[in-house]
């Protein structure tokens, strides 16, 4: 999801303009309100992101404001930064598009996730993604299209996996703020942001130091997803029944699968070259 040659419109709120300025070097704000209904994942991710930020504020009540929105870039990336005393978190529209491309293609295949919905409704022979590059615009130029699941249950399940992968990335960026990583980079390196890919400050810190920050952010993000899984399954009660436990197992699988796919998109040579 990317809007080329985007112009700021008068209806942008002051907060949206703040986000745009903070993320300008990364692409600025994606005006997702202008996108077609096919971008339905965006509002859902935005809503859950606000919930995660609210939870972070409950745990760290003295934490300055954190603002989340989407970045107008076709590439996959997540960024946490600090600007004028406020924190900003953004994930690129390209991240959502690439997740849709991969996950929808899986659920559109009748031989995958056969226990979800009615696989017989799906096409038996789908075109393969012949050459994957981590840039939605480049894929679009080569004629690559998103294959959508035809069965409604499978489509809904696919959308959930996409949402959770994106939310894991949001939680990861929140952790970069709450764990002090962004402040550390600002005070020690002079770079007030952390980007998952194409980060200019990568060589400014030791690889082990960067790895430790990323590992800590992953830990906090997944812990947040597990907390949501317990809440939604009802398995956090001493009287949890078999169905609730099974539901918890399923949710943990979904979150783990989604996070793993995101890791692949961010760093597997088979995806990013």
Region locations from a protein language model:
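Long, well-structured alpha-helical subdomains associated
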Residues: 210, 223-273
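A structural signal for the main folded, soluble domain(s) of proteins
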Residues: 174, 186, 190, 201-205, ...
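Histidine- and acidic-residue-rich, metal-dependent catalytic cores
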Residues: 217
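Hydrophobic or amphipathic, alpha-helical segments that drive membrane association/targeting
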Residues: 1-164, 179
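Post-HEXXH active-site segment of zinc metalloproteases
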Residues: 179-214
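Glycine-rich, flexible loop segments associated with nucleotide phosphate handling
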Residues: 154-166, 203-213, 240-256
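Catalytic Zn2+-binding segment of zinc metalloproteases
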Residues: 166, 173-189, 223-229
């Amino acid at each position: 999801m990317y809007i080329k040659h985007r112009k700021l419109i008068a209806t942008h709120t002051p907060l949206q303009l703040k986000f745009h300025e903070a993320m300008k070097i990364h692409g600025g704000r994606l005006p997702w309100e202008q996108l077609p209904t096919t971008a339905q994942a965006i509002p859902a991710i935005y809503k859950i992101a606000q919930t995660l930020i609210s939870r972070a504020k409950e745990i760290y009540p003295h934490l300055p404001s954190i603002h989340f929105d989407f970045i107008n870039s076709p590439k996959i990336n997540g960024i946490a930064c600090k600007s004028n005393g406020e924190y900003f978190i953004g994930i690129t529209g390209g991240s959502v598009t690439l997740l849709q491309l991969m996950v929808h293609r899986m659920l559109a295949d009748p031989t995958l996730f056969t226990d979800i919905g009615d696989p017989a409704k799906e096409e038996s022979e789908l075109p393969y993604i012949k050459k994957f590059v981590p840039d939605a615009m480049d894929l679009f130029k080569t004629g690559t299209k998103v294959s959508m699941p035809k069965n409604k249950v499978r489509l809904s399940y696919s959308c959930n996996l996409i949402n959770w992968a994106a939310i894991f990335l949001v939680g990861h960026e929140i952790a970069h703020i709450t764990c002090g990583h962004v402040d550390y980079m600002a005070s020690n390196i002079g770079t007030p942001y952390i980007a998952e890919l194409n980060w200019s400050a990568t060589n400014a810190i030791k690889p082990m130091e960067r790895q430790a920050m990323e590992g800590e952010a992953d830990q906090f993000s997944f812990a947040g997803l597990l907390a949501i899984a317990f809440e939604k399954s009802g398995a956090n009660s001493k009287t949890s029944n078999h169905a609730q436990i099974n539901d918890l197992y399923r949710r943990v699988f979904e979150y783990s699968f989604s996070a793993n796919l995101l890791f692949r998109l961010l760093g597997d040579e088979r995806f990013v070259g």
